Amino acid sequence: MPTNTLADWFSAPLGAYLLEKERAYLDDETPDIFGFHALQLGLPQYDLLRENRITHRMKIDVGGAVDVRARLNELPIATQSIDLALLPHALEFAEEPHALLREIDRVMMPEGRIVILGFNPWSLWGMR
């Protein structure tokens, strides 16, 4: 399911319910993650780091209303420069999930935090 389809699904009742649960989780878990630079990879139409206190936040995706347009496995970000990375369902739709994880590892600060949202692949929602 491409991310456009996922965004459409989040507009439907069941998807909106899940999106609200994910937002509530992120609002509770990310406010006190300290740092200077945060990025959200994918779903740029949603501000999923809205409660985080990091002032320099970037939304990166291949298109849409983003701060940086880039392939997610080729980020134009300096090595070891990101304090918080959010991947909202990015691994499910990545052409090369391992390449994406390697790229995230490259840009993360040594004590940086990575938050991954995804469907349980063994649940009914995770089935394709």
Stretch-by-stretch model annotation:
Residues 24, 28-78:
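Class I SAM-dependent methyltransferase SAM/SAH-binding core
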